[in-house]
Amino acid sequence: MAANTKVVAEQGDCVASIAAKRGYGWETVWKDEGNRELRESRKDPFVLLPGDEVATPAPKEREESCPTDRKHHFVLKTEPILFRVVLIDWEDKAFAQQPYELQVDGVQFKGQTDGSGGLEQKISPTAKEGHLVVGTGATKREYYLKFGYLDPLDTVSGAQGRLFDLGYYDGAVNGKLDGHTRSALLTFQKKYKLRPTEKNDKATQDKLKERFGC
């Protein structure tokens, strides 16, 4: 394997998107020896913090014979990744057996949520935005998605993002432990009978991971 180079993650990046741009599957990059410290600190290859360094092999080289008097197009093949989400309301009631339409970077998918309100769809590892419509009539819900923008759980911005998606927070995801963020943390802590610290402490992180999934 060619010598590794370091890629500095930006907002919206994950190991899968970084790997795909260099012609590799995410597992090849994630399991690379050069990412041992990253695996220890982040645990989840799909949740990075801007500034994280990801060791990546050099792009694969390949030779093709082509006439010189013509234009040629080469397409980089990438392995799709699984997008998974469970849809519930404030009372934890699932949006079960509901039709949905998911659009990701211009590609449309249709299906039905399962009995627990879940849906799964393979998407491009470099996808950035999506639009999800679930249900019809009075049960219709719309969600605007940004892939790769969730920060690690042990950061304030990571807690804000999860609290936002769970319906406890409607402010900016800015990494500031301000009054609005503390209020959202307190509401979440009270609902699940945690110590009301108004901080993103370990017990709160564990419960957020349980409720959110990562």
Model-identified regions with their sequence ranges:
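Structural motif
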Residues: 73-95, 166-168
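Acidic, Ser/Thr/Pro/Gly-enriched interdomain connector segments
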Residues: 89-91, 121, 127-176
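Extracellular LysM carbohydrate-binding repeats and other cell-envelope/extracellular binding modules
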Residues: 24-67, 190-214
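Short, ordered, surface-exposed loop/turn motifs in non-cytosolic proteins
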Residues: 92-105
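Primarily a LysM-type cell-wall glycan-binding module
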Residues: 1-23, 78-83, 153-157, 161-162, ...
